Amino acid sequence: MGESIMEQVEAIIAPVITEQGLELVDVEYVKEGAHWYLRIYIDKEGGVDIDDCTNVSHLVSEVLDKHDPIAQAYMLEVSSPGLERPLKKDEDFERFTGKLVRVLTKEVYQGYKEFTGYLVGLIEDDIVLEYEKERMAIPRAIVDKANLTFEF
């Protein structure tokens, strides 16, 4: 079985983004209405600006045109992951330890599908949060999404 479009795109664009001193945070390939969108989220220490996004858009467009992993027409969007960036890689969970996060699960876990708390980190294969001095270990296998959440 071959790689998914997302895996192919990530493999093609990651080196280009890394060469610019940026981090590839996430890639989405979604259909909205009649149009397909390839969304690439990038970041760096101190955040990205419009020039970073424009530069990456041009570079990624060139390399994707060369390798052509996507058959149909799509719109390319490059942006910052925003304040509520997704946490996907092990490094994300290490880097954002102590930050407020929101975790959504694919199924009900201990009576809930949504958890918010301060990230303790990854322990074995659980995402560990602390809220009001209680710790909750959520199995990563049932996590649908994990994001930083903005504190007011």
Swiss-Prot record:
A GO CC term assigned to this protein in UniProt: cytosol
Predominant localisation class: cytoplasm
InterPro entries (alphabetical): Ribosome_maturation_RimP, RimP_C, RimP_C_sf, RimP_N, RimP_N_sf
Record Gene3D superfamilies: Ribosome maturation factor RimP, C-terminal domain (2.30.30.180), RimP-like superfamily, N-terminal (3.30.300.70)
Cellular compartments annotated: Cytoplasm
Keywords, ordered alphabetically: Cytoplasm, Ribosome biogenesis
Any single GO BP term: translation
Entry superkingdom: Bacteria
The family this protein is said to belong to: Belongs to the RimP family.
Entry function: Required for maturation of 30S ribosomal subunits.
NCBIfam families the UniProt entry points to: PRK00092.1-2
Descriptive protein name: Ribosome maturation factor RimP
Originating species: Desulfitobacterium hafniense (strain DSM 10664 / DCB-2)
Gene this chain is encoded by: rimP
